[in-house]
C-alpha cells in the first residue's frame, strides 16, 4: 500500500468510526487486496479441498464488519488485525460445522484404509488450534494475540 493510500485508509477508518457510511464504501476497494492476502494466508494452511475460497472469506468478514457498531479503529494495523481475527473465527465456525456434519447422525462407522486416510501436509486442525489459543489467552493474552496475528494474519513483529 503506497503512503498516499495508507493515509487515505487511516482517514476513512476514522470517518467510518464517526458515522460516515460513505467512508466505508470508499474504504473497501482500498483494503480489499490486503484482506484477500490475509484470507489466502489463512486458507493456505487449510486442507487443499477446503470449500471456502479467499474471496468468500473476505466477503463473509466484510458482512461481519458491517455490523460493528460503531467501529472505532485505532489505526490500519488495528483494522487489519481485527479482520484477521474475524476470518479466523469464520474458519473455526466453518470447521466446527464440518466436524458436526461428519459425525454422521447415526450412520455406521467404517474403518478407513490408513494409506488413503493420510492427511494432507498442510492440514491444520483449526478447532484444536482455536482451543489452544483460547487456553493460552487465559494465561497470557498478549502472547495469544501475538501468535494469532503472526500465524493467521501474516503480520510481523
Predicted feature residues:
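Short helix-to-turn junction characteristic of helix-turn-helix DNA-binding domains
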Residues: 16, 150-151
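Helix-turn-helix DNA-binding module
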Residues: 153-157
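Sigma70-family region 2
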Residues: 17-18, 41-48, 60-79
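Σ70-family region 2.3-2.4 aromatic/basic alpha-helix that recognizes the −10 promoter
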Residues: 32-36, 55-63, 76-96
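Acidic, proline/glycine-rich intrinsically disordered inter-domain spacer in sigma factors
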Residues: 70, 111-137
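A short pre-motif secondary-structure segment
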Residues: 146-147
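Short, charged helix-capping/linker segments at alpha-helix termini
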Residues: 3, 18-27, 37-58
